[in-house]
């Protein structure tokens, strides 16, 4: 078993370095050997370089390296440098101490992979940006269960919304398994989930997502009224809905991605 795979060993390591888990960085260190192995298996095959965001104390980093991955680990918390240099000593890892949101993701090699226990507060903006780059073959990451549900939701469900459609536009999304708070140290207040995204190669479409954001901007309203409130001519929206065979009182959460794409075509040039 890894020396980082128990709360006791992690606590001892932190105390030895005079450190603590910092909530500012969303630090909840994964201490479950079983779940570490399952994450590595979900990320295989390692057909390109692997980028890990938020390596923390290096448990997942070590597991990936031992499985043969070529890893670049990006950590914002400079306090963890001596810890990572200790726990990953002798292993061929590239450590980068930088804010992951400022990393030049558009320049990573084509076919790269993301494998990470993501700091929860940056998960949504980071994943959205990585998908837009078109550089990744696969993204496998831990997030709050609630965020995973939003990424993989079906139409007509409470979790379905803009994030669901952004992810679906760029990738096939899978929620693989859930992790209890006890799999981490310190334990978070919520469950987590492992998500795997397999990009489809679809380019970014700003016009589509202006429409989607307008549609969900007034979630309690009908789609017709929400779009009218956002500046779309009501008559054009009514006409486009009729052309799609949709009733005038349809709501945004009833439309899947393909329906939004067709609606966007019907509203071309409307705003």
From Swiss-Prot:
Its main location: cytoplasm. The keyword Methyltransferase applies. SMART domains: rADc (SM00650). InterPro entries: KsgA/Erm, rRNA_Ade_diMease-like_C, rRNA_Ade_Mease_Trfase_CS, rRNA_Ade_methylase_Trfase_N, rRNA_adenine_dimethylase, SAM-dependent_MTases_sf. Pfam families: RrnaAD. Its EC number is 2.1.1.182. It catalyses: adenosine(1518)/adenosine(1519) in 16S rRNA + 4 S-adenosyl-L-methionine = N(6)-dimethyladenosine(1518)/N(6)-dimethyladenosine(1519) in 16S rRNA + 4 S-adenosyl-L-homocysteine + 4 H(+). One of its GO terms (cellular component) is cytosol. Specifically dimethylates two adjacent adenosines (A1518 and A1519) in the loop of a conserved hairpin near the 3'-end of 16S rRNA in the 30S particle. May play a critical role in biogenesis of 30S subunits. Belongs to the class I-like SAM-binding methyltransferase superfamily. rRNA adenine N(6)-methyltransferase family. RsmA subfamily. This is Ribosomal RNA small subunit methyltransferase A. The lineage of its organism: Bacteria, Thermotogati, Deinococcota, Deinococci, Thermales.
């Amino acid at each position: 078993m890894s020396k980082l795979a128990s709360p006791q060993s992690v606590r001892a390591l932190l105390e030895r370095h005079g450190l603590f888990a910092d909530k500012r960085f969303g630090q909840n260190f994964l201490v479950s050997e079983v779940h570490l192995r399952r994450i590595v298996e979900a990320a295989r095959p390692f057909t390109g370089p692997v980028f890990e965001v938020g390596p923390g104390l290096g448990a997942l980093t070590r597991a990936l390296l031992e499985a043969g991955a070529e890893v670049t680990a990006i950590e914002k918390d400079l306090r963890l440098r001596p810890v990572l240099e200790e726990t990953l000593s002798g292993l061929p890892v590239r450590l980068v101490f930088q804010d992951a949101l400022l990393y030049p993701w558009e320049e990573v090699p084509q076919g790269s992979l993301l494998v990470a226990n993501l700091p929860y507060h940056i998960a949504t903006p980071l994943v959205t940006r990585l998908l837009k780059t078109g550089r990744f073959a696969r993204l496998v990451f831990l997030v709050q269960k609630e965020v995973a549900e939003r990424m993989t939701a079906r139409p007509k469900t409470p979790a379905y919304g803009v994030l669901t459609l952004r992810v679906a536009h760029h990738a096939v999304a899978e929620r693989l398994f859930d992790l209890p708070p006890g799999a981490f140290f310190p334990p978070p207040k919520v469950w987590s989930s492992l998500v795997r995204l397999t990009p489809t190669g679809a380019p970014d479409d700003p016009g589509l997502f202006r429409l989607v954001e307008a549609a969900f901007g007034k979630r309690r309203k009908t789609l017709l009224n929400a779009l009218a409130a956002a500046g779309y001519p009501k008559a054009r929206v009514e006409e486009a809905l009729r052309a799609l065979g949709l009733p005038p009182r349809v709501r945004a959460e009833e439309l899947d991605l393909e329906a939004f794409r067709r609606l966007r075509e019907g509203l071309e040039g409307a705003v």
